[in-house]
Amino acid sequence: MKREHLYVSRRHPCVWLMALCMAASVVAALIAVQGTISTGLGIWCGIVLPCVAAILFALIAICAGGEMLYRTAVPVWIWSICFAIQSGKVIVWIACLLFCFGYTHIIGGKAKKVWLLPLCAAAFGGCLYLHSLPDALFAAGMILLWPAIKVHTDGKWHPTWGDRIDGRRVRTAQVMEQITAYFMPNRTGANNLFAESVEITELERYIRRKRKEGLTGFSMTHAVMAAYVRTVAKYPALNRFIAGQRIYSRGEDIAVCMTVKKELTAQAPDSLIKVHLHPSDTAAQVYRKFNEKVKEAKNEMETTADAMVAGFMAIPRLALKFAVWLLKCLDYFGLVPKFLLEISPFHGSVYFTNVGSLGIKPVFHHLYDFGTVPVFCAFGRKRRAEEIKDGEIVERKYLDFTFNLDERICDGFYYASVIKYFLRLLSHPEVLDNPPETVESDIP
């Protein structure tokens, strides 16, 4: 059965009535238990966790109900388990577990939402029967939210259980592909190094033409990025990543990361640029999007990423180590806030480094174990090579590339096809002026 994606709008009055009920549930819990609870378990199950569940339910529905309404199942589980513990009856445990599984199934879009009302009504009736006002108000809040729940009909992908903010879980991957991440949990232990060169006579001619057309700053970097974007349009599995031993796809969001210097000096600070590109982008669109980010980075005295790092470094060492550990745990479960993902150099589709301006050959840059970046592409200075053509010695110019690839996102044959297509685009860059005829989808 096709999964439905449910959502609520904060403009719906029932959403705010639900929030009012949840707030009343918290107040009632605090009033009802005064002087009646003496054990630690009683405090946690009678006050702390039910109040947390009520607040969390309301916050998820109001702040993230448009895309992540399914996460309201988490506070429902917390509330139901606390309710069952306080009751101590086997029949209540069975009823609560059935209710939790049913709610999770429905709110995740696996069943029609019309069944949500009788489930909530059953819980509400049970609460009234046991004369539990805080629990009754919590159940009433769930009932009030029901009329506001709608089904997404735009045909687009919306996250559900197992998905991340920055990626959709690839549930159709082969079994061997899925289990590989458990045997090779780190990127540094699952990377493949690859070096290749491309003859750039046509590419340099193309760059000169683009500059004459008005893209005055068009460079090798823009051409390489445009070719990579077009490659993802044909080979979408290149835009996958591994996180928490699961395979995810970024879909049509190509997050390109690059480090730039504000000035070409050894003492100049580095700034991270992250530009979001689309598989249908042309070379001109890549040029404009990338240059906007470069301009922002160079004009700002201190970027958001710089300020965040400075804040972390102000923390004592042991506390900082704990903060990093906590961040890794959040990343494992896909719970890192979106604003942190946006400024993180460790999260993206690909990391480019152009060392040509430094006059050196491209390096084999390591992958990051933390984060999601599965591909590191470096290119360096142009080089000349003498070759024999038709019995004569001719001089050609080449650009060298190095790739560091996470082998867990796709197999070797797929990677070989990707590299060949990428180099072919750079040999015939004029195709980058027009959008691709078709954009392949990684997940149908």
Predicted regions and their residues:
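Canonical alpha-helical transmembrane segments
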Residues: 51-67, 100-106
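Alpha-helical transmembrane segments
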Residues: 14-28, 73-79, 120-121
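Cytosolic juxtamembrane helix and N-cap/initiation of the first transmembrane helix
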Residues: 2-22, 38-49, 232
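Cytoplasmic-side transmembrane-helix entry/capping segments in multi-pass membrane proteins
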Residues: 67-75, 113-118
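Terminal signal-anchor or tail-anchor transmembrane helices
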Residues: 26, 120-128, 138-150
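Membrane-helix interface and helix-disruption motif detector
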Residues: 31-47, 62-69, 81-95, 108-112, ...
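Hydrophobic, membrane-inserted alpha-helices
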Residues: 53-57, 74-83, 97-101, 118-126
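C-terminal catalytic/motor cores of large multi-domain enzyme assemblies
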Residues: 5-6, 31-32, 70, 85, ...
